[in-house]
């Protein structure tokens, strides 16, 4: 499996003429279930837009089938059953051997005990890889010994699953990141990013990004951050850039349409927002 070199944000837009597929990462998206089938697709589409060379989805068959039927860009491995479980470890381990450089896990996964057991075992089997924990995977985060290569993306409510504080502030987010020895992106009206040493607030001065508070936008944010990590950015840089780009895109749509847009509409404006943030 690949071990991407750490890149600077300034290196992400302009690539060497000698670049080949997989030089800028292979992201594995693991998630989905019978009734929550869209999250892995949103993860994958956002990840491609954010520049990663290859995205592979591993999901229960309904979620995988929906993903490939929606877009020919998607590679999806359909797994048996309605939810993820330890019986899928062998299949996913074989996928990871194919130059995977980061794993995004949790979107639409559901909260079955067997799914949580699967997440913990998968993480423990591949501690050399960056893992991005989002959504339902955060509900078993207390069972995982994270490291500085990982990123957790809780919303305000989910923050309480991993922190002794229910309220995200600069102090509480930095303290929690230090405690779990990893990176946090706490999303909300103000996003907080910390690696335990630094903390940064991501705000929208226009007030128009408020309409991001709808289902699906978090899956897009997770896909962007995971894509940047898979390409070689540090989790802290990836989280700062990803959060700022999605807020920028949300504000652009909000100025034009107010709350009247689909989460997938963010995908149309993300390229300009990413160029804006990566070009700083």
For the regions a language model picked out, list residue spans one by one.
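Non-cysteine beta-strand/loop elements that form the S-adenosyl-L-methionine
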Residues: 148-156
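Small-residue (G/A/S/T)-rich helix-start motifs and N-terminal tracts that mark the onset
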Residues: 1-130, 139-148, 161-280
């Amino acid at each position: 499996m690949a071990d991407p070199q750490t890149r600077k944000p300034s290196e992400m837009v302009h690539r060497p003429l000698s670049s080949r597929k997989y030089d800028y990462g292979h992201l594995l998206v693991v998630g989905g279930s019978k009734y929550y089938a869209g999250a892995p697709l949103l993860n994958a589409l956002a990840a491609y837009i954010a520049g990663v060379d290859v995205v592979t989805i591993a999901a229960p068959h309904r979620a995988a089938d929906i993903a490939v039927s929606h877009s020919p860009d998607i590679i999806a491995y359909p797994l048996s059953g309605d939810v993820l479980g330890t019986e899928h470890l062998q299949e996913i381990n074989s996928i990871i051997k194919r130059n995977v450089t980061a794993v995004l896990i949790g979107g639409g996964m559901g909260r079955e005990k067997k799914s949580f057991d699967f997440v913990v075992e998968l993480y423990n089997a591949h501690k050399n890889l960056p893992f991005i924990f989002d959504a339902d995977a955060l509900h078993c985060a207390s069972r995982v010994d994270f490291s500085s290569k990982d990123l957790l993306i809780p919303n305000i409510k989910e923050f309480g699953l991993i922190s002794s504080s229910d309220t995200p502030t600069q102090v509480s987010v930095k303290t929690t990141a230090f405690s779990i020895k990893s990176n946090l992106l706490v999303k909300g009206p103000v996003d907080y990013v910390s690696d335990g040493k630094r903390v940064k607030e991501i705000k929208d001065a226009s007030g128009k990004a408020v309409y991001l508070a709808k289902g699906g936008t978090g899956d897009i944010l997770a896909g962007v951050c995971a894509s940047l990590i898979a390409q070689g950015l540090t989790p802290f840089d990836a989280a700062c850039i990803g959060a700022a780009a999605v807020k920028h895109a949300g504000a652009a749509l909000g100025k034009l349409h107010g709350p009247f847009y689909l989460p997938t509409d963010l995908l149309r404006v993300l390229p300009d927002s990413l160029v804006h943030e990566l070009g700083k």
